[in-house]
């Protein structure tokens, strides 16, 4: 089963916010997911992001692939750097 970390759209028309979910890659965008690991609100001035950092790192270490947008969000939050440091320090 290929697992992805990706965004699920929530909110109302013209006012979206997103949940960062871990889901099977074959599931629909807003369909079944395994776990919610954070949220992202692009409408706030500073693009508010909340993450369960330990869970994200655990899923990445298990082989979950982040989508391009989620990869950018994780990079800005410093999670990808921590993941690469832990991966190559072994």
Curated annotation (Swiss-Prot):
GO biological process, one term: translation
Gene it is expressed from: rpsP
Protein keywords: Ribonucleoprotein, Ribosomal protein
Pfam families referenced in this protein's UniProt entry, alphabetically: Ribosomal_S16
Gene3D superfamilies with a match to the protein in the record: 3.30.1320.10
One GO MF term: structural constituent of ribosome
InterPro entries, alphabetized: Ribosomal_bS16, Ribosomal_bS16_dom_sf
Family of the protein in this entry: Belongs to the bacterial ribosomal protein bS16 family.
Organism: Streptococcus thermophilus (strain ATCC BAA-250 / LMG 18311)
PANTHER family, per database record: 30S RIBOSOMAL PROTEIN S16 (PTHR12919), SMALL RIBOSOMAL SUBUNIT PROTEIN BS16M (PTHR12919:SF20)
GO cellular component, one term: cytoplasm
Record protein name field: Small ribosomal subunit protein bS16
Presence of the UniProt keyword Repressor in the record: no
């Amino acid at each position: 089963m290929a697992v992805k970390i990706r965004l699920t759209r929530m909110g109302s028309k013209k006012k979206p916010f997103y949940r960062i979910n871990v889901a099977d890659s074959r599931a629909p965008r807003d369909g079944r997911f395994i776990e919610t690991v954070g949220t992202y609100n692009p409408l706030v001035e500073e693009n508010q992001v909340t993450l369960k950092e330990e869970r994200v790192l655990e899923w990445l270490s298990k082989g979950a692939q982040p989508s391009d947008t989620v990869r950018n969000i994780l990079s800005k939050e410093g999670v990808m750097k921590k993941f690469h440091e832990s991966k190559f320090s072994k």
